[in-house]
UniProtKB/Swiss-Prot annotation:
Name this protein carries in UniProt: Phospholipase A and acyltransferase 5
Species this chain originates from: Rattus norvegicus (Rat)
Protein family according to the UniProt entry: Belongs to the H-rev107 family.
Summary of the function given for this chain in its UniProt record: Exhibits both phospholipase A1/2 and acyltransferase activities. Shows phospholipase A1 (PLA1) and A2 (PLA2) activity, catalyzing the calcium-independent release of fatty acids from the sn-1 or sn-2 position of glycerophospholipids. Shows N-acyltransferase activity, catalyzing the calcium-independent transfer of a fatty acyl group at the sn-1 position of phosphatidylcholine (PC) and other glycerophospholipids to the primary amine of phosphatidylethanolamine (PE), forming N-acylphosphatidylethanolamine (NAPE), which serves as precursor for N-acylethanolamines (NAEs).
Main location as per UniProt: cytoplasm
EC number: 2.3.1.-, 3.1.1.32, 3.1.1.4
Length: 287
């Protein structure tokens, strides 16, 4: 607080030494000695007007029209859309100024997730089959193809250009059905792999390569092509489709599918026979 200061913006009083007896306004009557004290007012600088950072579209009486135009020009310069990295800072400033934050939610759908979500059971089954097919490498000539049908596995041998040779029942009506395995004859057919699948999954399965040495590829293909369109005897136990393709690749007609069934059947028969024997065996008489 300045001595003699009456208010926050009133002019202060300044002292000046003048010779005694000198008349003038501000001479103190009680002054004594050679010099007296003269008080006079010095104009206090006016308070600077607070400049608003926010430009107003309305022109003020004390502000020239060109100032309003320049303010509007400044507003236009600062209105361009900010980059994404500066949006957070601008939003924080708006919150400090009491403005409502602008919320911009950008939802980016994931195309891959949408494609992975099937809408029906048929699409689920189709996706599984496609995944199983894509997981296998492309077959080479002479490879054995295992096809997983309902209740059993069908076998074919790959030749060329997505085509295979396989055993099929004489009637096309029976093709791909479980009744075809009970026929006593079959036709060697040259077909496209997709036509043989009948919507079933498949894989390359040369599982006997560790047991038998495969024949040369050119010999396998020659033997296979020589069998096309021939009618052969078919037997579920001794001459099925697996016997056929193994004979073409290794020269050994063998079916692990049948062997597994026979082994399991023997085990079941043994268990039944053991139970029968135990049931008819006389029990010791206890006192």
């Amino acid at each position: 607080m300045i001595p003699g200061h009456r208010g926050p913006w009133s002019a202060p009083l300044c002292r000046r030494l003048v010779p005694a007896g000198h008349s003038g306004m501000g001479l103190s009557p009680a002054a004594s000695g050679e010099y007296g004290i003269r008080l006079f007012r010095v104009p206090w600088p006016s308070r600077p007007k607070q400049i608003s950072r926010t430009a107003s579209t309305e022109s003020s009486d004390t502000q020239p029209t060109n100032d309003s135009a320049s303010s509007q020009a400044l507003v236009v310069q600062f209105l361009p859309k900010l980059p994404k990295q500066d949006r957070g800072l601008e939003q924080a400033r708006s919150l400090r100024q009491g403005q409502k934050p602008e919320i911009n939610l950008e939802l980016i759908p994931s195309k891959k997730r949408t494609e992975m979500i099937p809408s029906s059971d048929s699409e689920i089954e189709g996706n599984l089959k496609n995944q199983a097919a894509e997981s296998n490498q492309k077959p080479r000539p002479g490879d054995l193809i295992e096809i997983f049908r309902i209740g059993y596995e069908h076998w074919a041998i790959y030749v060329e250009d997505d085509c295979v040779v396989h055993l099929a029942p004489p009637s096309e009506f029976e093709a791909g059905s479980i009744t075809s395995i009970f026929s006593n004859r079959a036709v060697v057919k040259y077909s496209r792999l997709q036509d043989v699948l009948h919507g079933c999954s498949w894989k390359i399965n040369n599982k006997l390569d560790g047991t038998y040495l495969p024949l040369p590829v050119d010999k396998i293909i020659q033997r296979t092509k020589n069998m096309i369109n021939k009618i052969v005897q078919y037997s579920l136990i001794e001459g099925n489709c697996e016997h056929f393709v193994n004979d073409l690749r290794y020269g050994v007609p063998r079916s692990q599918q049948v062997e597994h069934v026979l082994v399991e059947g023997a085990k079941a028969a043994g268990a039944v026979l053991s139970a029968v024997v135990d049931s008819i065996r006389p029990k010791p008489i206890t006192a």
